[in-house]
Amino acid sequence: MSVIYLDNNATTKVDPEVVEAIMPYLTDYYGNPSSMHTFGGQLGKAVRTAREQVAALLGADESEIVFTSCGTEGDNAAIRAALLAQPEKRHIITTQVEHPAVLNVCKQLETQGYTVTYLSVNGHGQLDLDELEASLTGNTALVTIMYANNETGTVFPIEEIGKRVKERGAIFHVDAVQAVGKIPLNMKTSTIDMLTISGHKIHAPKGIGALYVRRGVRFRPLLIGGHQERGRRAGTENVPGIVGLGKAAELELIHIETAIKKETRLRDRLEQTLLAKIPDCEVNGDVTQRLPNTTNIGFKYIEGEAILLSLNKYGICASSGSACTSGSLEPSHVLRAMGLPYTTLHGSIRFSLCRYTTEAQIDRVIEVMPEIVERLRALSPFKNDEAGWLQAQEQTLAHR
């Protein structure tokens, strides 16, 4: 049975061209890029090329790219660097729907005397810019907001947010882990000060990422040690990973326009057909301002985990939320922040596509989903009894 992988917001397949680019740096070119000898110099050149490739994808200067190990490190580094550079300011603004790499850092900072404002979202997952405006003060050191939500695909009005942030003199950090490669970016014309990306979301290996730091932004490094990355991130460079990220960035820039069109078409077909064939289901999130590859659909009166297990029997991989919170018994914090009823958020499934997704794969999901939902609803003692279903959920949670 072949795998139908529709969980690309969790991670992606490494592109074969990326694998080919990496292999020599795992076997033949194994020196240290900081070494003075020719062997080390060859690796230094490879790192510089990769930096240029990543910069081109972001519309940035290569001097503004700092290689990291992942998106989580990038988020941590950006947040803490901004605060270390402005010790007199003790206020942070973020949203209720951020990735744990941002939310949990902010929660920890609250225990260290910082005040954090968590902006709310509406039923479509969008921010109220007036709430942002009212929250900004002279004491605000940092505003950290994701470009696009990893669970719903909702895209925030980043440049409008950035204009308001800059008017108040705060640093603006954006987690663009889900947006890069799906939305064209140009840091040269952007209001963003720092931006995080992660390799494994754009068909590069796991364990490599990058942080964009605008020239002139005060930056205090998270990792202290050697001189690597111009003193902004200590530690011997992961050359195979960096080369892989560079090649992946080059390929994303080549494919981005065709990928956006293809993924949008396949996503819309999947979404519209399921909504037409299956009663009591709805799309979660903004249906206009969103990523081209992502749909999050709530199937009422059944559990998302049961849907995923049923899909898995057909070799179909999807998600009920962020892979970084999948071990939690609680429903998605993103969908809860949107105020969705429990009958919807407990049965919500995210399908996330990529440039490798095919028509035949979408056809297969469309074929099996109606039967899965019908069977699971038939097994439910409450079916479409919303009050009874909610009571059963509360009792289940109380005994866990």
UniProtKB/Swiss-Prot annotation:
The lineage of its organism: Bacteria, Bacillati, Cyanobacteriota, Cyanophyceae, Nostocales. Gene3D superfamilies: 1.10.260.50, Aspartate Aminotransferase, domain 1, Type I PLP-dependent aspartate aminotransferase-like (Major domain). GO terms for molecular function: cysteine desulfurase activity; iron-sulfur cluster binding; metal ion binding; pyridoxal phosphate binding. The keyword Transmembrane does not apply. Belongs to the NIF1 gene cluster which is expressed in heterocysts under anaerobic and aerobic conditions. The keyword Membrane does not apply. Belongs to the class-V pyridoxal-phosphate-dependent aminotransferase family. NifS/IscS subfamily. Pyridoxal 5'-phosphate binds at residues 71-72, 150, 178, 198-200, 236. It comes from the Bacteria. Catalyzes the removal of elemental sulfur atoms from cysteine to produce alanine. Seems to participate in the biosynthesis of the nitrogenase metalloclusters by providing the inorganic sulfur required for the Fe-S core formation. Its cofactor is pyridoxal 5'-phosphate. It is an enzyme of class 2 (transferase). It catalyses: (sulfur carrier)-H + L-cysteine = (sulfur carrier)-SH + L-alanine. This is Cysteine desulfurase 1. The active site is at residue 324. GO terms for biological process: amino acid metabolic process; nitrogen fixation. The modification N6-(pyridoxal phosphate)lysine is found at residue 201. Homodimer. Keywords: Iron, Iron-sulfur, Metal-binding, Nitrogen fixation, Pyridoxal phosphate, Transferase. [2Fe-2S] cluster binds at residue 324. InterPro entries: Aminotrans_V_dom, Aminotrans_V_PyrdxlP_BS, Cys_deSase_NifS_bac/arc, Cysteine_dSase, PyrdxlP-dep_Trfase, PyrdxlP-dep_Trfase_major, PyrdxlP-dep_Trfase_small. SUPFAM superfamilies: PLP-dependent transferases. It holds the Pfam family Aminotran_5. Its EC number is 2.8.1.7.
